[in-house]
A protein has these predicted regions:
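Conserved helicase motor core of SF1/SF2 NTP-dependent helicases
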Residues: 1-134, 138-206
Length: 206
């Protein structure tokens, strides 16, 4: 699960008991780019116990992560729809809008519908992901991968400095193969604040 296991030594002790067992750590990340992985690692490094297990990307460079500030959630929805259209024109087929909670996903979906469009919403009841453009809550995103990911709301009111939010942000940031956009309005989450460019320009690469 997205919560994860805190101490694998307990698993080895109580599950495998006296049987011979060995713990191996898979550190290499083959999904995402150096630029994306380096930013995600800065988030997960806030959990001291996970620092030794931070992902090491294969040497595949790509675009820098884009941090985009908007005045409201409605403005975020509008900009994301434009980015989706542009990404598809550029040939990207699998695109995900990741919201923190299911309620936020539904709010996003409702605003999209008011604009005369629909996007598939992943609820966890699906047997498989068939591709295309989807909206997915952060806690269901683990194990999935997409060409492009847009984190819809990385505001401080959504992501605080606690272990659960750190893990959810990390999972969300490590889903894309090629391109990552992170949106927020109001105050940016402290998890990313040290990465924000002082220029404050829309679409700041960081």
């Amino acid at each position: 699960s997205y919560r994860g296991i805190k101490d694998w030594s307990d698993v080895m002790q109580y599950v495998f008991d006296d049987r011979k067992s060995q713990m191996l750590t898979l550190e290499q990340s083959y999904r995402t780019t150096v630029e994306i992985m380096s930013k995600a690692n800065r988030v997960i490094s806030r959990i001291d116990a996970l620092r030794p297990f931070m992902g090491k990307p294969v040497i595949r460079h790509g675009e820098k992560v884009r941090l985009i500030e908007k005045k409201s959630f409605k403005d975020i929805v509008s900009d994301i729809l434009e980015k989706i259209d542009k990404s598809r024109e550029e040939g990207y087929q699998s695109i995900a809008v990741i919201c923190k909670t299911m309620d936020e996903c539904k709010a996003f979906s409702d605003l999209v519908r008011k604009r005369g469009r629909t996007l598939d919403l992943i609820t966890g009841k699906e047997k498989e992901y068939k591709g295309g453009v989807v909206i997915v809550p952060s806690y269901l995103a683990k194990g999935l991968e997409f060409d492009v990911v847009m984190i819809a709301n990385a505001s401080s009111m959504r992501y605080e400095v606690n272990e659960l939010d750190i893990k959810l942000m990390y999972v969300s940031m490590t889903r894309p193969l090629h391109r990552l956009y992170i949106y927020y309005y109001g105050e940016l989450t402290p998890l990313l604040r040290d990465s924000k460019d002082s220029s404050g320009q829309e679409g700041t690469a960081f």
